[in-house]
Amino acid sequence: MILGMSVGTFTVLHVIITLIAIGSGLIVVGGMFASHRLPVTTALFLFTTALTSVTGFLFPIHGFTPALGVGILACVVLAVTLFALYKEHLVDTWRWIYVIAAVASLYLNVFVLVVQSFVKVSALSALAPTQTEPPFAITQAAVLAIFILITLVAIVKFRPPRAV
């Protein structure tokens, strides 16, 4: 039981929260490309991303695992994102720091989605049962390359007017 829910029910809740984080994050990145802040969608993205990390830490932990490492990294990156946006208000270098951190937060959610897809989706699991096979590595490399490109474009395009 986790928070009064079966592990299965809690897992479904965690996945729904994560999918909301990914969906809203993609909208936020689209806003960056158009130089729009999208404050409500951004708040949803950051909140659900934080909730994804928090709920991820509530699963049973048996020693340090790559999943735990990604969760810790996600929290650090999210803290930088929040600081750049809400404390420094995207002023000067904080604008591009925010872009990098926000897109990295989204990337980490997608990275875990890919990992879990290869674990849970039988067709993908058959291609890479241990996540060390080429189909898994190629997929993760492609996702990383796409997110690097997204980050570079967002850094150039995201130049919102200063908040008053």
Model-derived regions: residue spans:
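Polytopic transmembrane helical bundles with strong interfacial aromatic enrichment
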Residues: 2-164
